[in-house]
Amino acid sequence: MKLNEIRDNEGATKNRMRVGRGIGSGKGKTGGRGVKGQKARTGVSIKGFEGGQMPLHRRLPKRGFNNIHAHDLNEVNLGRVQAAVDAGKLDANAPVTVDALVKAGIIARARDGVKLLGVGELTAKLSFEVTRASKSAVEAVEKAGGSVTTTFAAGVAHRGASEGAVASA
């Protein structure tokens, strides 16, 4: 037996049934749809339609709203930053900025900024330049001998700042 001769066992796969291909197939003529009526026609399915009964999405009350002023921040835990320093992905002597976190692979891309959270151990002396930081994160960084500076630049201004340009907000 060779790799190019490997096949599925007999009966392991089943061919797709093609409907409407002659009465001898057993699924010809009406193609398994019964006779006439709304459900026999094409394009019958209207999403959420319940035959005239008030549909579920209209029976339930509206709730909440989308805040257009909300800041979409990346959350970064101190434990992940320490792991990146240990792995050599982050330079302990350079300030930890949004750009540095993206290059280290800790965050995929900069959204509206970064919030530093105090989960995990931090032993390296680091200086952070982030959008926000929790109290526990600030305490842990200062205990390790580092510092935290918070700056905020929204949207396009933030992207410009992360590319080396000066943010004017």
Swiss-Prot record:
The keyword Disulfide bond does not apply. InterPro entries: Ribosomal_uL15 (IPR030878), Ribosomal_uL15/eL18 (IPR021131), Ribosomal_uL15/eL18_sf (IPR036227), Ribosomal_uL15_bac-type (IPR005749), Ribosomal_uL15_CS (IPR001196). The keyword Ribonucleoprotein applies. GO terms for cellular component: cytosolic large ribosomal subunit. Residues 1-40 are annotated as: Disordered. GO terms for biological process: translation. Residues 1-13 have a biased composition (Basic and acidic residues). Disulfide bonds: none annotated. PANTHER family: 50S RIBOSOMAL PROTEIN L15, LARGE RIBOSOMAL SUBUNIT PROTEIN UL15M. Binds to the 23S rRNA. This is Large ribosomal subunit protein uL15. It comes from Methylorubrum populi (strain ATCC BAA-705 / NCIMB 13946 / BJ001) (Methylobacterium populi). The lineage of its organism: Bacteria, Pseudomonadati, Pseudomonadota, Alphaproteobacteria, Hyphomicrobiales.
